[in-house]
Swiss-Prot record:
One of its GO terms (biological process) is 'de novo' NAD biosynthetic process from L-tryptophan. It holds the Pfam family IDO. Activity is inhibited by D-1MT (1-methyl-D-tryptophan) and MTH-trp (methylthiohydantoin-DL-tryptophan) but not L-1MT (1-methyl-L-tryptophan). Its EC number is 1.13.11.-. This is Indoleamine 2,3-dioxygenase 2.
Amino acid sequence: MEAQRQDGKLASSLSLGKYHISEEYGFLLPNPLEELPDHYKPWMEIAHRLPHLIESHQLQAHVYEMPLLDCRFLTSYREQRLAHLVLAAITMGFVWQEGEAQPQKVLPRTLAIPFVEVSRSLGLPPILVHSDLVLTNWTKRNPEGPLEIGNLETIISFPGGESLQGFILVTVLVEKAAVPGIKALVLGVEAIRQHSQDTLLEALQQLRLSIQDITRALAQMHDYVDPEIFYLVIRIFLSGWKDNPVMPVGLVYEGVSTEPLKYSGGSAAQSSVLHAFDEFLGIQHCKESVDFLHRMRDYMPPSHKAFLEDLHSAPSLRDYILDSGPGGCLMAYNQCVEALGELRSYHINMVARYIISAASKARSRMLTRLSPHALEDRGTGGTAVLSFLKSVREKTMEAILCPGA
């Protein structure tokens, strides 16, 4: 009786709106704000000029002249999300303006205090995260037009030109491609609760197609992002101050803490999409990978993290399929796992091109003094990137079910 009550509670709670998940845009923030109230004009003036201010080595001087602004005029959730993006972007530019050789160790109080305040209100860390760079950082050129790269632009940018735009906007398209898959998870949980194999089969087929669409969307990265520009110019502005050899003690947030604080940089692992797919499919990763992936959930909007936790608590898809015996659902499940493994293989190849190969080319061209070489074998989130991704792919493929298992 208790199990039935719990299942019913979980099924009813997996309505996307409860978790700030859009039926149309998934984890993307629908139609993000592009401007803050006039009170925050000093922030916006700097944020809109970030590429120029960083490249001309003027950003730090402008930050030191910023007034300390009160956050109480940020009255809506969407305003807070834009404020977090703006302050995070200014922070990354401030810390890394002079490259990895001269990172700033202290964030001035006029930036640190409001950034930490907004972060606490949102339940996010005071550093640039995936929900800033991607989920909140897109707008349509033509509001009535399609969500495709030719009709998209970023709200806040960094040095890197078209490659930086491409990196962010292709990732927006990846998040959009995941929307049918996210809906399939909710449908699948309900199907298990209702013991409806036909509905579950439909959900699994929808999930597989979505995963394949994600892989196709990710492939556009090669069309829009130059590996050398990503490695030499863009990557440093996604790097954090945890598990980073060039900032071993972290960053002091002046007016907030006298001790340095450590936060990981941006990482694909901060996207909720593959976490959600793993939870639904019952993929079991090794402890080291799990520790990192779960730490990355603290870099997600709390409502998205709650969705993942509720998926974890939902009835087990693998157990249901094994109990049901060989059939269409088992085959469809395995096809989902295979598609997820193929996506992860594609991601590995992309990381090899954009980080490993780009680092090697930089060394061969005697450009290493310009490149973030201390980070060259690590993701911006602080992981040893290839070994982590290969482990995650291996554990994904181990989830394949054998008939009669």
